[in-house]
């Protein structure tokens, strides 16, 4: 039996890299520039096929708007965001950034991409939690 190999889109790769960098930023509190540089150096081969301008925009703009993003998320979380798994928090922050500021990206795409990224990086059931939270946030941002 042959396995179907899925080609990952450059934007999905950008989101995955942005989540990894947001996670590093939240854990280390190093500067975004330092995190990005170290990531690119460490992941040189993995950066092929990444929409680099979109990756940089997602990573830096999510950090620039983190207070707004966190206050947008807070009413829809079942716990404080500091109690969230750091990967779940990074995925949610990125998705809320896209829902709130990247209006050219359909909300269904944002939610689906967040779920798919959670399946790669999150805990076993985290994609379900991410989906539930984003399904509540999207209508509140008039994205449904």
UniProtKB/Swiss-Prot annotation:
SUPFAM superfamilies assigned to the protein according to its UniProt record, in alphabetical order: NusB-like
GO biological process, any: DNA-templated transcription termination
The UniProt record lists the keyword Transcription: yes
Function comment: Involved in transcription antitermination. Required for transcription of ribosomal RNA (rRNA) genes. Binds specifically to the boxA antiterminator sequence of the ribosomal RNA (rrn) operons.
Gene3D superfamilies: NusB-like
Record-stated family: Belongs to the NusB family.
Signal sequence annotation: none
GO MF entry, a single one: RNA binding
Organism from which the protein derives: Histophilus somni (strain 2336) (Haemophilus somnus)
Protein name (database record): Transcription antitermination protein NusB
Cellular component terms per the entry's GO annotation: cytosol
Top-rank taxon, per record: Bacteria
Alphabetized UniProt keyword annotations: RNA-binding, Transcription, Transcription antitermination, Transcription regulation
